[in-house]
């Protein structure tokens, strides 16, 4: 496989992943971003921890979807993430009424 073939394959996978995301984002309540991953989840718990002066965050997600094109199964029941970096958690805005497109 040439470098060009690999790049084309990765581009197609990324586009497919984006389409999947657009189809399912409305089924989730939260968007969670860490330095390594992007998640959609229906339940998020974040607990700041402090061990010997080192602050880190423990995240527990339930009913989640992981943005990862190399993962064959992106839906997971439970996710536990430990990170020393920034975490962004946003509630997904759900409009009261959806008009047909």
UniProtKB/Swiss-Prot annotation:
Superkingdom of this protein's organism: Bacteria
InterPro entries membership: DUF2469 (IPR019592)
Keywords: Acetylation
GO annotations of cellular component type: plasma membrane
Protein name: Uncharacterized protein Rv2901c
Residues recorded as bearing N-acetylserine in the entry: 2
Keyword presence, Acetylation: yes
């Amino acid at each position: 496989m040439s470098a060009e073939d690999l790049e084309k394959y990765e581009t197609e996978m990324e586009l497919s992943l984006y389409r999947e995301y657009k189809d399912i984002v409305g089924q989730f309540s939260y968007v969670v971003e860490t330095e390594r991953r992007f998640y959609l989840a229906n339940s998020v718990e974040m607990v700041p921890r402090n061990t010997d002066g080192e602050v880190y965050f423990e995240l527990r997600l339930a009913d989640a979807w992981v943005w990862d094109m190399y993962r064959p199964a992106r839906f997971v029941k439970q996710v536990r993430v430990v990170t020393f970096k920034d975490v962004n958690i946003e509630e997904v805005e759900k409009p009261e009424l959806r008009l047909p497109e």
